[in-house]
Amino acid sequence: MCDAQDWFTESYPDNGSALSLKIRAKLHEEQTPFQRIEIYDTESFGKLMVIDGCTMVSDRDNFLYHEMMTHPVLYTHPAPKTVWIIGGGDCGSLREVLKHSEVEKAVQIDIDERVTRLAERYFPELCEANGDPRAELLFIDGIQWVKEAPDGCVDVIIVDSTDPVGPAEGLFNEAFFRQCHRCLRTDGILVQQSESPLFHLPLIASMHRIMRQAGFAQTRTLFFPQFIYPSGWWSATMAGKGDLNRFRADAAEAKLFPTRYYNADIHRAAFAVPEFFGDALRELV
């Protein structure tokens, strides 16, 4: 919400906290068939996209999220050629995926085309890869897309979704994970944004349990900073048909494209498990 002093504030009542950003102006607001989208110009974080009152993307720190949702999984898979991005309408994850020359096809499936069109207008740097011949943008229900896809047709699935409410709620259950498992090839990996380890620990633990129930052999969670998200600390959880410890470190160290956060050392560090998190997994998984 915006208050009289020109601050945008997102409150987290369940955790007794909030995030506020000083704004210069509201640039856009609309209600789509799926959600309410707002764009602000802020004093310190550049442009900010807000969906249903929740911060999604800012100019200043989006690189943290997009790099960590993509490069760790792509350097864990032995040979990622085909990638699906479920959600990801701001196109930042698509841009990072297509920095990998070995990727031959990347399909982004987002239910709300307006997110992408507004990103193209207000966050054009995130959409630089939209015209890449390897990219395909679909504006349909990602859950239905996965359900109708053939067996063993994709190497990596990235679920770059909003919080597990509204249009994204169906992306956090066993039925969806089973369909992803079916669609993945032998060494296939699913990675899904999994909220804050401080605020949403039971959700992450349940994701590990449900992913394994859906047939995945291994699960691992990686951690990274994300200032505009609840608690400022975020996570992504991988589920693999095979070994998730096969980090292609030589390839990561020799990467031919620039990143602002991700490198081989960050990759290793991101998977370090805090004691409280390990305890929760042992208790709840």
Curated annotation (Swiss-Prot):
Residues 5-241 form the PABS domain. It is an enzyme of class 2 (transferase). Gene3D superfamilies: Spermidine synthase, tetramerisation domain, Vaccinia Virus protein VP39. Transmembrane segments: none annotated. Its EC number is 2.5.1.16. GO terms for biological process: spermidine biosynthetic process. Keywords: Cytoplasm, Polyamine biosynthesis, Spermidine biosynthesis, Transferase. It is found in: Cytoplasm. Spermidine binds at H66, D90, D160, S161, T162, D163. S-methyl-5'-thioadenosine binds at Q35, D110, D141, G142, P167. It holds the Pfam family Spermine_synth. It catalyses: S-adenosyl 3-(methylsulfanyl)propylamine + putrescine = S-methyl-5'-thioadenosine + spermidine + H(+). GO terms for molecular function: spermidine synthase activity. The active site is at D160. Belongs to the spermidine/spermine synthase family. Homodimer or homotetramer. HAMAP family: Spermidine_synth. This is Polyamine aminopropyltransferase. It comes from Methylococcus capsulatus (strain ATCC 33009 / NCIMB 11132 / Bath). The gene is speE.
